[in-house]
Curated annotation (Swiss-Prot):
Feature: compositional bias, Polar residues: 415-426
Recorded topology in the membrane: Lipid-anchor; GPI-anchor
Signal peptide annotation: 1-27
Compartments where located: Secreted, Cell wall; Membrane
Protein's organism: Candida albicans (strain SC5314 / ATCC MYA-2876)
Gene encoding the protein: HWP1
Ranges where the record places region 14 X 10 AA tandem repeats of [EVIQ]-P-[CDT]-D-[YNW]-P-[PQ]-[QI]-[QP]-[QDN]: 46-187
Gene deletion effect: Reduces the overall mating frequency in both liquid and solid media. Impairs stable attachments to human buccal epithelial cells and reduces capacity to cause systemic candidiasis in mice. Produces a thin biofilm that lacks much of the hyphal mass found in the wild type cell.
Stated name of the protein: Hyphal wall protein 1
Post-translational modifications: The GPI-anchor is attached to the protein in the endoplasmic reticulum and serves to target the protein to the cell surface. There, the glucosamine-inositol phospholipid moiety is cleaved off and the GPI-modified mannoprotein is covalently attached via its lipidless GPI glycan remnant to the 1,6-beta-glucan of the outer cell wall layer.
Pfam family name, one: Flocculin_t3
GO CC terms, sorted: cell surface; extracellular region; fungal-type cell wall; hyphal cell wall; mating projection; side of membrane
Ranges of the Sequence repeats in the UniProt entry: 46-58, 59-69, 70-81, 82-91, 92-101, 102-111, 112-121, 122-131, 132-141, 142-151, 152-161, 162-171, 172-179, 180-187
């Protein structure tokens, strides 16, 4: 069957008309998609077809107006005006020609250096001065007189002969050092000594007198040794018998001065030796020898040597309260030597500090008890409140009583008295409680009520443990509410401490007072926001339609404890909100998981993909129909 041209044109027109309606389906789908977006996310995105109209009509039209009228017009006004001010500034440099007038004064100043030519005439007087140094050649003749002076030091060679006599000196003090008392050393500078001036005359005479006849004669030898640092100044007497050196000093002459001490050795008889200056005329020609008397007592009494030293009187002036008083203090050293040597030294004290000690009371009974009273301090405490002050006295001190056992008691004043009957509510330490599915309803989040203290809490409560409540077990909680805690009457000794409770979304929470068996079957949508997924040990899967909200509320302690050891995966159904409940004082940080939120009001419009798929299917269907009709007609 063949069709006419008119029929073919009509069929083609019909086909084109059918094909023209297909984009309307796409446009309808885009419009409905925009409506869905507006309902779900509260914003509306305009179709892409509207952008060309905005760019061509509104935006391009605004820019020519701004660039051509406002902005370019302002610059010509600002720039020409500012440069116009610069020609006025060159007027300031016009003042500089006036300043060069000041340098005109400098030609006048060079006239002053013109006065210097007369000054060079003054240095001309210096040539006569070089003639003055010419007088110095006679001065070198003066040092020529020094050659006779070296002849004077030539007289010194006889002087080295004098130090030649000194070698015996170092040998002399070694024998006398142990016999010299050390107490005399500070008195050495007080008495001047006269050195011997005649070293060439040896001492050969010694006069010794004995008060009584003795069976053994004393032989005296006079070697050239001396008892001091001056050579040939004193003569020691030595005998083969045992010697006891005794010295009685009649003057304050130090022991190290020459001719001051002469040791005397005697046998069993009493021997007194007196050395005078007349008996040894050659030893000390220019100094006087003090008389040294040595007495040896009988052998039955111990020998005692008493030496009197110089004493010093110190005047101490003490001033206090504008009044000064003077006191004399005598200082010195007294040494008494017997079988035992005792040294007593007196040192004045500048300040006297009284020391007071309380006597210890001792009981005569078998147990020894000592009570010591320490000094007490009275402290006045002034307390002010509401414009009124009160004073109170507090006595502090320490009392120590020692018996068989030592007990220390210390009193310390307290600044504030805290009554011991105060008790802190223990609502922040509720026991860990796992709520099974459908066991207890919770309260909406966002409402905060104070926790009631427990009446009985054992001391063996453990650390906080996260609490997981299965999904769909409780009515949903709107985010931001806090449920109050209900006091617990009796808790066993093995209950755990506060634990964060994880409540699945989609359930409504009410105060956990008495348990109720109301099923949790009321899902309610939650506004979109930041969702938090619980970070627990078990794997928790939440679909896109669920929203997690964070809630902080103290747990409602109950008498029923469900097993909390199950770590299986918790599956949260769609259209549910997982609410994280942190109980006690231990916050729980939850991991944020962005989820999709469906529209609050369900729309009868299908998703965009449905319309896109429908459009594509319609195009394919119409194309196949057209091809079939064309093939059928041809």
């Amino acid at each position: 069957m063949r069709l006419s041209t008119a029929q073919l044109i009509a069929i083609a027109y019909y086909m084109l008309s059918i094909g023209a309606t297909v984009p309307q389906v796409d446009g309808q789908g885009e419009t409905e998609e925009a409506l869905i977006q507006k309902r779900s996310y509260d914003y509306y995105q305009e179709p892409c077809d509207d952008y060309p109209q905005q760019q061509q009509q509104q935006e391009p039209c605004d820019y020519p107006q701004q660039q051509q009228q406002e902005e370019p017009c302002d610059y010509p006004q600002q720039q020409p005006q500012e440069p116009c001010d610069y020609p006025q500034q060159p007027q300031e440099p016009c003042d500089y020609p006036q300043q060069p007038q000041e340098p005109c004064d400098y030609p006048q100043q060079p006239q002053e250096p013109c006065d210097n030519p007369p000054q060079p005439d003054v240095p001309c007087d210096n040539p006569p001065q070089p003639d003055v140094p010419c007088d110095n050649p006679p001065q070198p003749d003066v040092p020529c007189d020094n050659p006779p002076q070296p002849d004077v030091p030539c007289d010194n060679p006889p002087q080295p002969d004098q130090p030649d006599d000194n070698p015996p000196i170092p040998n002399i003090p070694t024998d006398w050092i142990p016999n010299i008392p050390t107490d005399w050393i500070p008195d050495i500078p007080e008495k001047p000594t006269t050195p011997a001036t005649t070293p060439n005359i040896p001492a050969t005479t010694t006069t010794s007198e004995s008060s009584s006849s003795s069976s053994s004669s004393s032989s005296s030898t006079t070697p050239k040794t001396s008892a001091s640092t001056t050579p040939e100044s004193s003569v020691p007497a030595t005998t083969p018998n045992t010697s006891v050196p005794t010295t009685s000093s009649e003057s304050t002459t130090p022991a190290t001065s020459p001719e001051s001490s002469v040791p005397v050795t005697s046998g069993s008889s009493i021997l007194a030796t007196t050395s005078e200056s007349s008996s040894a005329p050659a030893t000390t020609p220019n100094t006087s020898v003090p008389t040294t008397t040595t007495e040896a007592k009988s052998s039955s009494t111990p020998l005692t040597t008493t030496t009197e030293h110089d004493t010093t009187v110190v005047t101490v002036t003490s001033c206090s309260n504008s009044v000064c008083t003077e006191s004399e203090v005598t200082t010195g050293v007294i040494v008494i030597t017997s079988k035992d040597t005792i040294y007593t030294t007196y040192c004045p004290l500048t300040e006297t500090t009284p020391v007071s000690t309380a006597p210890a009371t001792e009981t005569p009974t078998g147990t020894v008890s000592t009570s010591t009273e320490q000094s007490t301090t009275v402290i006045t405490v002034t307390s002010c409140s509401e414009s009124s002050c009160t004073e109170s006295e507090v006595t502090t001190g320490v009392v120590v009583v020692t018996s068989e056992e030592t007990v220390y008691t210390t009193f310390c004043p307290l600044t504030e008295n805290t009554p011991g009957t105060d008790s802190t509510p223990e609502a922040s330490i509720p026991p860990m409680e796992t709520i099974p599915a459908g066991s207890e309803p919770s309260m909406p989040a966002g409402e905060t009520s104070p926790a009631v203290p427990k009446s009985d809490v054992p001391a063996t409560e453990s650390a906080p443990v996260p609490e997981m409540t299965p999904a769909g077990s409780q009515p949903s909680i709107p985010a931001g509410e806090t449920s109050p805690a209900v006091p617990k009457s009796d808790v066993s000794a093995t209950e755990s401490a506060p634990a964060p409770e994880m409540t699945p979304a989609g359930t409504e929470t009410k105060p956990a007072a008495p348990k109720s068996s109301a099923p949790a079957t009321e899902p309610s949508p939650v506004a979109p926001g930041t969702e938090s997924a619980p970070a627990g040990p078990g794997a928790s899967s939440s679909p896109k339609s669920s929203v997690l909200a964070s809630e902080t509320s103290p747990i409602a302690p109950g008498a029923e404890t469900a097993p909390a050891g199950s770590s299986g995966a918790i599956t949260i159904p769609e259209s549910s909100a997982v609410v994280s409940t942190t109980e006690g004082a231990i916050p729980t940080t939850l991991e944020s998981v962005p989820l999709m939120q469906p529209s609050a009001n369900y729309s009868s419009v299908a998703p965009i993909s449905t319309f896109e798929g429908a459009g594509n299917n319609m195009r394919l269907t119409f194309g196949a129909a057209i091809i079939g009709i064309a093939a059928f007609l041809i």
